[in-house]
Amino acid sequence: MSILNLVRADLLNSKNYVPGGESARYRSHANELPWSPVTMGEHNLNYYPNIGLQIELQKQLAKRYQIYSDQIILTRGSDDGIDLTTRLFLTAGKDAFMQFPPTFPMYAFYVRLQQAELIECPLDRRTNFRLTLDQIENSWKPNCKIIMFCSPNNPTGNLVDLNLIAKTCELYANQSIIVVDEAYIEFANAPSATSLIGEFENLIVLRTLSKAFGLAGLRLGCIIAQSPIIQAFNKIIAPYSIATPSMELAKRALNNSDWFTKTIEQIKSSRAWVIKKFADNPIIEKIYPTETNFILIQTRFSKQLTTWLAHYGIAVRDFPSSSLLHDHLRITVGHDEQNQLLINTLSSFNADVAGLNYEKDFIY
């Protein structure tokens, strides 16, 4: 069975959009203006993005991720990769998508847009949200077209074991696409699932430049998979979807490996410092192990703390509507000044006033 049989049947015979006129002296085919009010180096922004620039960036990323250049396609951040994946494989009213909550809420968002079934296999906080193969097998159904791992998981911070990913790929080789969202993998002391790409044709890995690379404003990411799957994605991706300035700035940033290495080490060091300070705070009941640039904590004062911190200009992520995380907060590790302000503000929170109705009684 070809892995392409998992692609939506109505898309299999569709044709890729192929831009033309890339090397033409006069671009009289694309209805562009001959002038631009701004320029960016050698790039004329009055023209649609050049495919050559995209190929260069894909090769640069392929080298970094240790894959072949035909195993990668650029996306507008990880969200775009999730959207494209659900659109390529899920048939409305027929196929299902499995996720492991608590996890990134955009998975369910795009599944709903595709009008597909959502299979939820909840993680248990008593085991620090560890996932097992038995859980997957007990939740899987024959119409499950996509199994989505987030590793490290957002918002819990833990990794999915690489052996578990490999076993899942093998177990559902001709039945499901296995997707691994690795938005935070650079912060982890663990190998990437990209190391499995050559072994499993039903594996897709999503990466982004928004987190560890510090380029969230560029909206750039990529889909990594074996070449036939990448070619299938080309059938549905929008033409000229990646902006010229985003690609050019990303290329420049990726050349600065020293900055990247230093920044990752700084975040890891700061993360350890913040965790130590959290451990000294009596209102924080649990600190979950993390392989990311954020920390998940449990506190019965989650609602009050969110309001208290907001009063001092600090935004944190709470989960008031979650049955699993209603008494938890996710807090991002920042630079030294941000981290110190966070710790000082948490320390100033007095458990004696936690019973106030902050929406009513707190004076701003």
UniProtKB/Swiss-Prot annotation:
The lineage of its organism: Bacteria, Pseudomonadati, Pseudomonadota, Gammaproteobacteria, Legionellales. CDD domains: AAT_like. The gene is hisC1. GO terms for biological process: L-histidine biosynthetic process. The keyword Oxidoreductase does not apply. It catalyses: L-histidinol phosphate + 2-oxoglutarate = 3-(imidazol-4-yl)-2-oxopropyl phosphate + L-glutamate. SUPFAM superfamilies: PLP-dependent transferases (SSF53383). Belongs to the class-II pyridoxal-phosphate-dependent aminotransferase family. Histidinol-phosphate aminotransferase subfamily. This is Histidinol-phosphate aminotransferase 1. It comes from Legionella pneumophila subsp. pneumophila (strain Philadelphia 1 / ATCC 33152 / DSM 7513).
